């Protein structure tokens, strides 16, 4: 978002109010409630157990944002809310996304007081820092909701990869860090000869199995629980796919080299930094948040990935750019 005038500056400084109002509406299910039946302010206040006066101002704020509209029967979702929220992802996935942003918010509170800290900002604020993966290891519920959310969000990406990848000679696929198996399931629909093994943490695998059971290709996809950085990986694969995993090292690539059959391919899909200490535009938001945890954090570049692949024994094949900016790097054993 680029600011062009003084009013934009004022709006940006107060944007946390609108963001919080929207996130609350999503987490409490307001748009879905109003889609079932229009309600006036007292009706919303009663349904969601919100003090009436506060609720009225909240609804007025959402109305000013163009997210709800008012008619004689009460408030209802606007056309924008219907097309951008109700008709896109499930209520559960939207609620997870809104909650995730809310949980990130404390990191940037009082940023002016803590941005000079030489270490993690949350520690200076007296808050705990826990990685995404650790939170999912400790909470099957969170892992399940996260996995279902990414399954919905990554449908376009799965379609793009199914169109791009040449699967000639590929019968056994390892989907490393594949979560729900969203990309695998798309490939399995297209290629009846293909089988896939998704490798991820146990709680994610549990959620993935549930999602896979809803598909006709369920018999051709399995889930292997493992910490792929520290544990051995299964072998004899024709292709390993590493899509939006975000963690790379030469040591990991050597393990993947060993897991592939001779002539097998490794396919890496991600937003990479265009240069050292320059964030990918698609990842600028997250890169900044990561720097609040680790002030020396830096995104890896495609050139660094390719160098690690070469050092691990791979032969580089191709580099493609998907709509949205993700790079697809392919290498052969």
PLM segments and residue spans:
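Alpha-helical subdomain
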Residues: 1-63, 172, 180-185, 189-333
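Conserved Class I S-adenosyl-L-methionine-dependent methyltransferase catalytic core
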Residues: 8, 12-16, 22-24, 32-33, ...
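Conserved beta-strand/loop positions that form the S-adenosyl-L-methionine
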Residues: 176
């Amino acid at each position: 978002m680029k600011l062009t005038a003084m009013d934009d500056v004022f709006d940006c400084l107060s944007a946390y109010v609108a963001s919080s109002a929207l996130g609350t509406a999503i987490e409490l299910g307001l748009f879905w409630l109003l889609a079932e039946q229009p309600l006036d302010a007292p009706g919303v206040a009663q349904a969601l157990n919100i003090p009436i006066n506060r609720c009225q101002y909240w609804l007025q704020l959402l109305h000013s944002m163009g997210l709800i509209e008012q008619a004689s029967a009460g408030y209802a979702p606007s056309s924008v809310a219907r097309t951008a929220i109700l008709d896109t992802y499930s209520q559960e996935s939207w609620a997870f996304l809104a909650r995730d942003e809310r949980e990130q918010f404390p990191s940037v509170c009082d940023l002016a007081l803590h941005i000079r800290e030489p270490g993690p900002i949350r520690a200076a604020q007296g808050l705990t820092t826990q990685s995404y993966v650790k939170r999912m290891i400790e909470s099957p519920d969170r892992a399940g909701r996260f996995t279902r959310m990414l399954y919905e969000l990554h449908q376009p990406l799965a379609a793009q990869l199914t169109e791009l990848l040449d699967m000639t000679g590929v019968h056994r696929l390892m989907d490393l860090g594949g979560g729900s198996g969203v990309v695998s399931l798309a490939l399995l629909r297209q290629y009846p000869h293909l089988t896939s093994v998704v490798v991820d943490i146990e709680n994610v695998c549990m959620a993935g199995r549930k999602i896979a059971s809803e598909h006709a290709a369920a018999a051709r996809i399995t889930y292997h629980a493992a910490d792929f950085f520290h544990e051995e990986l299964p072998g004899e694969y024709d292709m390993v796919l590493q899509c939006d995993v975000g963690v790379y090292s030469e040591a990991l690539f050597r393990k993947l080299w060993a897991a592939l059959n001779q002539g097998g391919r490794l396919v890496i899909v991600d937003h990479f930094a265009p240069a050292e200490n320059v964030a990918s535009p698609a990842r600028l938001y997250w890169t900044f948040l990561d720097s609040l945890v680790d002030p020396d954090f830096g995104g890896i570049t495609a050139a660094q990935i390719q160098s690690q692949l070469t050092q691990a024994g791979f032969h580089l094949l191709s580099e493609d750019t998907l709509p949205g900016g993700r790079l697809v790097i392919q290498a052969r054993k």
